[in-house]
């Protein structure tokens, strides 16, 4: 059985594990490796190494840092096939989706190659007689990134390129179910020339995560995961004096207006709902059909969804893989059962799906449920599976009220050909990322990613300009260089003329 270790100080590290986690292939149901679970001593060692390395790394010139980021970007491109196969084996998504994930993550490396521009400060001359002021942005220190299973490459890449490029050391805690991409990333950073100890990978259970949140040697925490855990991360981290960004769950809605091109909407809704088996925080699990367009929309979405080839991620032509594990499959089917019991109509049922040769895999087919009650769990819970719930509204006003009633506010979209309605929507909707005829409005890397309400705790979004601000601290420097003229010191706040 293959053993997956940590990565500390530029090399694999076994330490003194407190246990082992069985890493399963969701497409086969077979255990493929065992992941070492870190002890407190292992985490302490990683933090000690990171703190020592960060002090020297922060002194490295921006030119040298960007050079390393350029090399890292190319290495990720060169090794994307290897990384994608790791993702297929541990997460289950199909190969093309895994490649797409890596490419989207690499966009943040693109942004990090221009960190010298992002770190440009401000300068004001002559704020008083002979006095100038300028600002600096300096690294916060040691950053921990706690990441989910669904994007083993992309979500960490939302964090570590900017954190590292701005002069921090980084400790990545990957999801135990999908650790291998993190280890490959560490190897590539070393090959790119990053000094040992600046990027580390430590795996562990909930006890270790609690230790991360409380550790005095960790200065900042980036988290992406469920909302309940995001609350724990935010509250515990802040209580222990850390800078925290905690991105939580989602239950994204799209409004479909009757004036929209329904086939265009259906095609894009199908891709947004069922891509990556719905296991993404920007998936589209809920559609609000307005003005009686629901039955026609459901029929059109079904026509697209029925064409999706479900199977093992490396098999030719497969467009959708399994969900992550048996527990997740059971949870999702339970939500469908609950909606059906409360009067919903299952238009397309993926529950009975079995893939020949992969009978132990955790497969669900695309599922469409119409006339979903607002009281059903399928409507209110974060599904994280290949299920689309369709609810109905008579007017735009009723539809936007339904969208905004959700405690989540990650992403939201509208399909319409009416510019006035679209403009109202972008102002009315309570979400951090908004799409107009775009069902998955994920920003590119030079914009920031983040939701509202229960989808983001705190106020700092991830990557882009807000990512730079999160991983750095501002410093204002006021200077005066005395000349032959002497200025008297003053105790007042009055400016000298």
Language model features with spans:
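N-terminal Rossmann-like NAD(P)+-binding subdomain of aldehyde/semialdehyde dehydrogenases
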Residues: 1-131, 324
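Conserved C-terminal structural/oligomerization subdomain of aldehyde/semialdehyde dehydrogenase
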Residues: 25-34, 218, 255, 309, ...
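Residues at or immediately preceding the N-termini of alpha-helices
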Residues: 26, 40-43, 62, 95, ...
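Residue-level signal for inorganic ion chemistry
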Residues: 29, 65, 87, 109, ...
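Short, well-ordered beta-strand elements within core beta-sheets of diverse protein domains
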Residues: 32-38, 52-59, 145, 254-257, ...
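Structural signal for hydrophobic packing residues in well-ordered secondary-structure cores
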Residues: 54, 58, 73-80, 84, ...
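Rossmann-like NAD(P) dinucleotide-binding subdomain of oxidoreductase/dehydrogenase enzymes
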Residues: 121-264, 393, 458
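ALDH superfamily catalytic-core signature
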Residues: 228-373, 436, 485-487, 492-497
């Amino acid at each position: 059985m293959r053993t997956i270790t940590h990565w500390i100080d530029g090399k694999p590290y076994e330490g003194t594990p407190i246990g082992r986690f069985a890493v399963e292939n969701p497409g086969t149901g077979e255990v493929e490796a065992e992941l070492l679970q870190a002890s407190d001593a292992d985490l302490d060692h990683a933090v000690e190494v990171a703190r020592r390395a960060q002090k020297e790394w922060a002194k490295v010139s921006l030119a040298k840092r960007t050079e390393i980021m350029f090399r890292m970007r190319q290495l990720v491109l060169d090794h994307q096939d290897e990384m994608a196969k790791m993702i297929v084996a541990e997460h289950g998504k199909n190969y093309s989706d895994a490649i797409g994930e890596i490419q989207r993550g690499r966009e943040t490396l693109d942004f990090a190659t221009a960190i010298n521009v992002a770190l440009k400060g401000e300068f004001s001359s002559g704020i008083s007689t002979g006095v100038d002021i300028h600002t600096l942005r300096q690294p916060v220190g040691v950053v921990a990134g706690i990441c989910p299973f669904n994007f083993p490459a992309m979500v960490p890449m939302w964090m570590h390129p900017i954190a590292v490029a701005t002069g921090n050391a980084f400790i990545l805690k990957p999801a135990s179910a999908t650790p291998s991409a993190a280890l490959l990333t560490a190897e590539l950073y070393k090959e790119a020339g990053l000094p040992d100890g600046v990027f580390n990978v430590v795996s562990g259970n909930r006890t270790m995560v609690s230790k991360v949140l409380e550790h005095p040697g960790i200065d900042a925490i980036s988290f992406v995961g469920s909302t309940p855990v995001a609350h724990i991360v935010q509250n515990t981290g802040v209580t222990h004096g850390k800078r925290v960004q905690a991105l939580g769950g989602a239950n994204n809605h799209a409004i479909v207006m009757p004036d929209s091109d329904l086939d265009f909407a259906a095609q894009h809704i199908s891709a947004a709902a069922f891509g990556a088996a719905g296991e993404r925080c920007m998936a589209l699990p809920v559609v609000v059909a307005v003005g009686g367009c629901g039955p026609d929309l459901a029929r059109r979405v079904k026509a697209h969804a029925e064409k999706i080839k479900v199977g093992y991620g490396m098999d030719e032509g497969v467009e959708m893989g399994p969900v992550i594990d048996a527990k997740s499959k059971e949870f999702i089917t339970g939500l469908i059962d609950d909606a059906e019991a409360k009067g919903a109509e299952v238009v397309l049922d993926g529950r009975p799906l079995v893939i020949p040769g992969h009978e132990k895999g955790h497969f669900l087919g695309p599922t469409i449920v119409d006339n979903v009650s607002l009281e059903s769990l399928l409507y209110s819970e974060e599904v994280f599976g290949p299920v689309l719930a369709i609810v109905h509204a008579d007017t735009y006003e009723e539809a936007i009220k339904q969208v905004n009633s959700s405690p989540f506010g990650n992403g939201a979209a509208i399909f319409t050909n009416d510019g006035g309605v679209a403009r109202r929507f972008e102002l009315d909707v309570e979400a951090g990322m908004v799409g107009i005829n775009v069902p998955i409005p994920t920003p590119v890397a030079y914009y920031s990613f983040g939701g509202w309400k229960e989808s983001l705790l705190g106020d700092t979004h991830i990557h882009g300009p807000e990512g730079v601000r999160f991983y750095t601290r501002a410093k204002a420097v006021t200077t005066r260089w005395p000349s032959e003229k002497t200025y008297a010191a003053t105790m007042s706040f009055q400016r000298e003329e």
